[in-house]
């Protein structure tokens, strides 16, 4: 019986010490019938993301037209050292491309 009480008290202490999830300060989403969209959010702990998507026509490997969604956006957060980080990105028929101070740069060939 003492073991059950000890386990119950331990579990209660663990649950009581769980941090609250960060509050959402802003949240938006709008999708159009043709497939384009805009969305974004921001939380009280410094995390945010904003993104747009637009449908465009592109050519595949066989030069046949097809629709692709071109995505552009950015996200930000505070790293463990307290530094704000911002990553900007886009994705299209050529792939995903991101840039930011925390992303290593590819050295140029000479």
Curated annotation (Swiss-Prot):
Keyword vocabulary terms for this entry: Cuticle, Signal
Is-annotated flag, keyword Mitochondrion?
no
Q: Where is the Chitin-binding type R&R domain?
A: 34-107
What is known about what this protein does? Component of the cuticle of the larva of tobacco hornworm. Seems to participate in the formation of 5- to 10-fold thinner lamellae in the endocuticle.
Q: In which tissues is it expressed?
A: Specific to the epidermis. Expressed in all the epidermal cells of day 3 larvae except for the bristle cells and those at the muscle attachment sites.
Q: Name one GO cellular component term.
A: chitin-based extracellular matrix
Q: Indicate the segments annotated as coiled coil, or none if absent.
A: none
Its recorded name reads Larval cuticle protein 16/17
Return one GO MF term: structural constituent of chitin-based larval cuticle
Q: Which residues form the signal peptide?
A: 1-16
InterPro entries in the cross-refs: CHIT_BIND_RR_consensus, Cuticle_Struct_Prot, Insect_cuticle
Query: One Pfam family of this protein, by short name?
Result: Chitin_bind_4
The conditions that induce or repress this protein are given as:
In day 1 epidermis, by exposure to hydroxyecdysone in vitro without juvenile hormone.
């Amino acid at each position: 019986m003492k073991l059950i009480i000890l386990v119950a008290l331990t579990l209660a202490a663990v649950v009581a010490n769980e941090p609250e999830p960060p509050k959402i300060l802003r949240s938006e989403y709008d999708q159009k019938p043709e497939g384009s969209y805009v969305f974004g959010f921001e939380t009280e702990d410094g995390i945010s993301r904003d993104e747009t998507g637009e449908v465009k026509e592109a050519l595949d490997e066989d030069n046949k037209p097809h629709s692709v969604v071109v995505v552009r956006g950015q996200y930000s957060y505070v790293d463990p050292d307290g530094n704000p980080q911002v990553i900007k990105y886009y994705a299209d028929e050529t792939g995903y491309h991101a840039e930011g101070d925390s992303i290593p740069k590819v050295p140029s060939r000479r």
